[in-house]
Amino acid sequence: MPNEVEVRAQARHALTGDKIPRRDPDRTWGGPGADMPCTICAKRVTVSQMEYELQFRQDGATPGLDRYHLHLRCFAAWEMERTKLEDRR
């Protein structure tokens, strides 16, 4: 797994590239991995690992729920980087 500097850079890239929202999630779930790719690092979050699933409501013409799977470490990097970006605004 990448070191903290690399993970934070990946989180910044995901945020600035609109791969994941900057706002607070509407729901956050934690538990065993769902064997889905992590939105931040693109590596699978296996069932033997813990993950956060972030859910964001989507309004508009096609309402729904966007889900993002993150390793715990990637979630921490996302949280730090998104709050840093908000502070700059």
Q: What kind of feature is each model-predicted range?
A:
Residues 3-24:
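Short, charged low-complexity linear segments at domain edges
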Residues 5-8, 64-89:
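Short metal-binding segments enriched for Cys and/or His
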Residues 22-36:
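Short, flexible, mixed-charge glycine/proline-rich loop motifs
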Residues 38-42:
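Short cysteine-rich clusters marking metal-coordination/redox-active sites
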Residues 48-53, 82:
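Short Cys/His-rich "knuckle" micro-motifs
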Residues 53-68:
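Short linker/helix segments within small regulatory modules
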